[in-house]
Amino acid sequence: MPKQLMEIKDFLIKARRKDAKSCKIKKNPDNTKFKLRCSRFLYTLVITDSEKAEKLKKSLPPGLQVKELK
């Protein structure tokens, strides 16, 4: 079941949870989508600023499996 998050802080809090398994990063010409797979929900975050997206990518937890999609 997908849920969309609007705040970067909320996304980072969810990414640090124990049940967070993986994060898929999907880049488009106009935005970047972060899809976080947890045990119950798939959380999505859409960022239109590419600099903020790069910062968020670097600040993801090191134990989280990150996969970049085209």
Curated annotation (Swiss-Prot):
Which source organism does the UniProt entry give?
Answer: Artemia franciscana
Cite the Pfam families for this sequence. Ribosomal_L38e (PF01781)
As recorded in Swiss-Prot or TrEMBL, the protein's gene is named RPL38
Q: Which GO terms describe its molecular function?
A: structural constituent of ribosome
The name on file for this protein is Large ribosomal subunit protein eL38
Q: Give the family per the record.
A: Belongs to the eukaryotic ribosomal protein eL38 family.
What keywords would UniProt list here?
Ribonucleoprotein, Ribosomal protein
Query: Which branch of life, at top level?
Result: Eukaryota
InterPro entries for this protein: Ribosomal_eL38 (IPR002675), Ribosomal_eL38_sf (IPR038464)
Give a Gene Ontology cellular component term annotated to this protein.
cytosolic large ribosomal subunit
Tell me, which GO biological process terms does this entry list?
Answer: protein-RNA complex assembly; translation
PANTHER family for this protein: 60S RIBOSOMAL PROTEIN L38, LARGE RIBOSOMAL SUBUNIT PROTEIN EL38
